[in-house]
Amino acid sequence: MITTIEDLHEHLQWAIELEHATIPPYLCALYSIKDGSNIESVEVIQSVFIEEMLHMALVANIMIATGGSPKLDYPEFIAKYPTPLPHSDESFQVDLNKFSPESIECFLKIERPANADAPSQDEGFASIGQFYKALEEGLVYLSQKLGDKVLFTGNPDHQVTAETTYYGGAGHLICVTDLNSALKALEEVVEQGEGLDHENIFDGDKNMFHPEREEVGHYFRFLEILEGRNFQIGDTAKSGPSGEKFIVDWDQVHPMAANPASEDYTDNPAVLEKLTTFNQEYSDMLRVIEKSFNGEPKLLGQAVGVMYELKILAKELMEIPTGDGKTTVGPTFEYLPRKISDSEFIEVRENGPYVVHGDIPLIRKKRITGQKGEAIAWQKTKTHESDTIYELCRCGKSANKPFCDGTHDRINFDGTETARTSKISETQEILQGDGVRVKVDNSYCMHAKFCFNQKSGIRKLMAKGADDDAKIHVSAMTERCPSGTCLLYTSPSPRDKRQSRMPSSA
């Protein structure tokens, strides 16, 4: 149950993970279709993929509106396939596979509506709609408990909207400013196919490729492929599609091997290089999307351009034989960290400023606090305009902070480092819980107050051991600690799967 802002942000992050987990499988099926064939099926999969991107943006807008910071740049964000849907009941596995009846059956399981009376489920859900119902209930509860002015503190200018980003698919980008707009954003996601029970199979939008047609939800679009026939007005879930027939040719497909991994090609440098190029491009694209979700919404357009490059790379991979005489290579969708350029570094000048090299953005954030003074979230307030190389004040006396204005020369600043150089192992304290531990080093503390909330402090929460609710709060506290005082280390176990997916400061 979602009862705090920390819970809400945790579950919104899960929703972003969940939406993203469907994208690599959809793209593998889409890219495996040979050019010029299966036109209708290509349109279906492409439309669903585009809407999954929309759903990520809508969820991110809710997170931004409530003071959160969406994250896409951490290794666990890209699932290792085959995998169950993140935070689901794990009743089925999702594969990276070619376009086939089996892959479409898998997509139907992903998008299946729940029964109308299915309860909300914030974890271990059978359908995505149950999870979104829990998000809706959490938003309503927090709005009633805190009021919209306390709950919705984020800067709307940081959201991805029609004013910042061109969106050519069905549905709408919604700027979230209060409970009503947040619920509309969730409704957009649910009605496009990840919903509860559709007595009406149409989602209220026009088909993006055929504007004269009403659009059906994701589940029913994939059903059209299996049936080789479109739904039309008057059709129902029980009747099935009765509209125009179309050709589905399962043979006009690159025979990509299921669930490829880079480790399968360590003895083939040429293939490994292509896989690395694809994975670096994909990981870099996620980093651009993360930036667009954190105050630079216009950057999202760059990610669209990268998608075309990824399509070319994926199709090149799918033409390379694996060597078994039957299958070809395929994209592996594996996380790679950002390449650090030799030109990116911070120079500490003697008795002078910090000199930042490499066009590194300088961002100012402020703390959002609760009624008891506890820190709830970081809110981005400004990205400073700066050159590729810029100087930051180290003497503390600049009149143009955070930038250096030369004051250090006038006051004869002594820049001798006085920080302690003790080994971390000698100064840190380890708080041990069941399946999770936190390393605390108070010598780094800057008193940002993220290590306690209305319920408790991090030490008391750690003492609760296996309490899942306590672990959620501990993860949120350590993830937001700006100084590195509190670092979260997890020991994943079968009954502690949520923690293994959480981004942390460690």
Segments and roles (model prediction):
Residues 13, 341-345, 389-393, 438-443, ...:
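Short, recurring structural edge motifs at helix starts
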Residues 43-44, 372-387:
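A cross-kingdom feature marking solvent-exposed beta-strand/loop segments within repeated
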Residues 1-337:
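Non-heme di-metal
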Residues 489-496:
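Conserved small/polar residues in nucleotide/adenosyl-binding loops
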Residues 339-360:
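Short helix-coil boundary/hinge micro-motifs
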Residues 416-436, 453, 457-479:
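Ferredoxin-type iron-sulfur electron-transfer modules in oxidoreductases and energy-metabolism complexes
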Residues 392-402, 439-455, 468-484:
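Cysteine-centered iron-sulfur cluster-binding motifs in ferredoxin-type domains/subunits
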Residues 408-415, 460, 488:
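Iron-sulfur (Fe-S) cluster-binding segments and ferredoxin-like electron-carrier domains
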